[in-house]
Amino acid sequence: MIFHVVTRQNWQKALQQGFYEADSLASEGFIHTSKANQVAGVLERYYPQHALLKGPCDLVLLHIDEIKLTAPLKFDMATSVNETFPHIYGRLNIDAVVKVEKL
C-alpha cells in the first residue's frame, strides 16, 4: 500500500474525470506518494497548516493498492531527506484507490 495526500476538491475532480493527475505529473513527470511510515513526515514538511489545525481540514489521504496501478511505479531517492519514495509515472487510475481517509 502506498499513500498520497490531496485536497478534497482535487479528489472530487478526479472522480468526475475518472483519473487523477497531480500538478507534479506535468512539472516533474510523476505523482509523489509515500510508504505508510513516511506519511507523517510528508504532512509535517509539506502541509504544516494541517499539523497546526488539530482538527478536520480540506485534505484526504488516498490509500493506493500498487498492484492495481496501470502506470509504472518506481522508488526514487529524495536526497533532501535521504529516503526512497514511491512515485507513480503517469495518471493514477481511480480503481487503484482502495480507501479515502479524511485528515
Question: Where do the model's predicted regions map?
Answer:
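Conserved, structured core segments of small domains
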Residues: 1-103
